[in-house]
């Protein structure tokens, strides 16, 4: 009887360890954070992470073996996406636990914020209030495919790499909220600084669309 119980327990923990293996690599966590934003091809993930196609495919296979991602063949490309919404919750839970339990994570956040002069960080609560005002413009800095997948209501899409060339088209009589992929992305702060340096009243919302949706009704 004891042996049956032990085998049962060991089999379950062995299965769960596959999830642990998926999360044991910083690059696999980065891939998951990217896929939270929307489905992507292997080539797109490779470009975003700076890894070779071969390394990207290897990491994706491990994530697929752990059932954290699924894939679909579309023409000449293989497209990957998060397996289900629980995985999205898991990614953000991991980020939140890291921020709370690891002093290094908070130090990195603080040092980066301190290094970015002329930024106006805002909380989600402040952003919700500002979004209700007609004089506020929300800019989503993510690539177009991620914006098309999901975005904050009434936000416009100006990918970070195109922001500087579009500055002349932005209204200076409105407050501007910029957001990107969340707390592990530097673009919101950098975009806020760029806009403020050019005479705008810009605010950095260092939160993701997921954070916006999850917290807006609380």
Task: Please identify what each model-predicted range represents.
Residues 1-23:
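N-terminal leader segment of winged-helix/HTH proteins
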Residues 15-54, 78-83:
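N-terminal helix-turn-helix DNA-binding core of bacterial DNA-binding proteins
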Residues 42, 81-137, 141-149:
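Flexible, polar/low-complexity N-terminal or interdomain linker segments that lie immediately upstream
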Residues 47, 64-65:
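Alpha-helical residues within the helix-turn-helix
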Residues 60-61:
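Short, hydrophobic-biased segments on the C-terminal half of alpha helices
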Residues 65-74, 81:
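Beta-hairpin "wing" of winged helix-turn-helix
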Residues 68, 170-212:
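Catalytic cysteine-centered active loop of the rhodanese-like fold, especially the PTP/DSP P-loop
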Residues 126-184, 190:
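Positively charged, proline/Ser/Thr-rich regional signature most characteristic
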């Amino acid at each position: 009887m004891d042996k049956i119980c032990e085998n049962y327990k060991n089999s379950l923990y062995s299965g769960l360890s596959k999830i642990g293996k998926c999360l044991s690599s910083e690059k696999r966590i980065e891939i998951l954070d990217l896929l939270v934003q929307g489905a992507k091809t292997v080539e797109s993930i490779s470009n975003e992470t700076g890894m070779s196609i071969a390394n990207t495919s290897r990491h994706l296979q491990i994530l697929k073996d752990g059932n954290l991602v699924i894939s679909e063949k579309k023409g000449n490309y293989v497209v990957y996406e998060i397996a289900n919404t629980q995985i999205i919750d898991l990614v953000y839970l991991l980020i939140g636990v890291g921020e709370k339990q690891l002093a290094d994570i908070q130090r990195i956040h603080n040092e980066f914020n301190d290094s970015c002069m002329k930024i106006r960080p805002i909380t989600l609560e402040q952003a919700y209030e500002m979004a209700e005002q007609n004089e506020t413009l929300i800019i989503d800095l993510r690539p177009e495919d991620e914006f098309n997948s999901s975005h904050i209501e009434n936000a416009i899409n100006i990918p970070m790499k195109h922001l500087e060339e579009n500055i002349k088209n932005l209204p200076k009589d409105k407050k501007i909220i910029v957001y990107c992929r969340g707390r592990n992305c530097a673009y919101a702060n950098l975009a806020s600084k760029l806009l403020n340096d050019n005479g705008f009243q810009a605010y950095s919302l260092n939160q993701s669309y997921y954070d916006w949706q999850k917290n807006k009704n609380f």
